[in-house]
Amino acid sequence: MEIKELIAKATANMEKAVEYLDEQLSHVRAGKASPKLLDGIMVMYYGNATPLTQVASINTPDAKTIVVTPWERSLIKDIEKAIMDSPLGITPENNGELIRLGLPPLTEERRRQLVKQIKGDAEDAKVSVRNARRDAIDAIKKSVKTDGTPEDVAKDAEAEMQKVHDRYIKKIDELFAEKEKEIMTV
């Protein structure tokens, strides 16, 4: 494999790690109501587990409330049960037509738990980025031995790989810091 391809492949893997972290962080409740909080909830719909977003509309009328309006009234009990069974820890209010979810303010202890959780997620993303760099550098060194790639070209490629690595690690740190600030803001 050519060196440019190795760097491109490693960069793509690093980008995937950052995108995955961003997705993970979007599901962490930071005190503000967000429809994304309900993304992972599955509702039994005609015997099949179906994502809540496919059987109801989800709105946030204010920063502390999520409103779930089922497209079929008969689903309201199933939606309520799915939300209660989820790890969100939110008790739904069912008025027969829609479900309101009032988000209680986060306690200091819960905020610290969330920060600890996202710190672990960020560390996992960093490990993925480092692994992509290591694999690319190993492949570059191998190409020097087997394909006859010049040493100076290999050194330049390793330096380039390090720059890409540093850029993605910085991105991960920025995502973490932003989410941490969001969680810790009362």
UniProtKB/Swiss-Prot annotation:
Sorted UniProt keywords: Cytoplasm, Protein biosynthesis
Main location: cytoplasm
Molecular function via GO: ribosomal large subunit binding
InterPro entries in the cross-refs: Ribosome_recyc_fac, Ribosome_recyc_fac_dom, RRF_sf
A single cellular component GO annotation: cytoplasm
Location of this chain's protein in the cell: Cytoplasm
Annotated GO biological process: translational termination
Role summary: Responsible for the release of ribosomes from messenger RNA at the termination of protein biosynthesis. May increase the efficiency of translation by recycling ribosomes from one round of translation to another.
PANTHER family for the chain: MITOCHONDRIAL RIBOSOME RECYCLING FACTOR PSEUDO 1, RIBOSOME RECYCLING FACTOR
Family assignment from sequence similarity: Belongs to the RRF family.
Annotated protein name in UniProt: Ribosome-recycling factor
Species assigned in the record: Porphyromonas gingivalis (strain ATCC 33277 / DSM 20709 / CIP 103683 / JCM 12257 / NCTC 11834 / 2561)
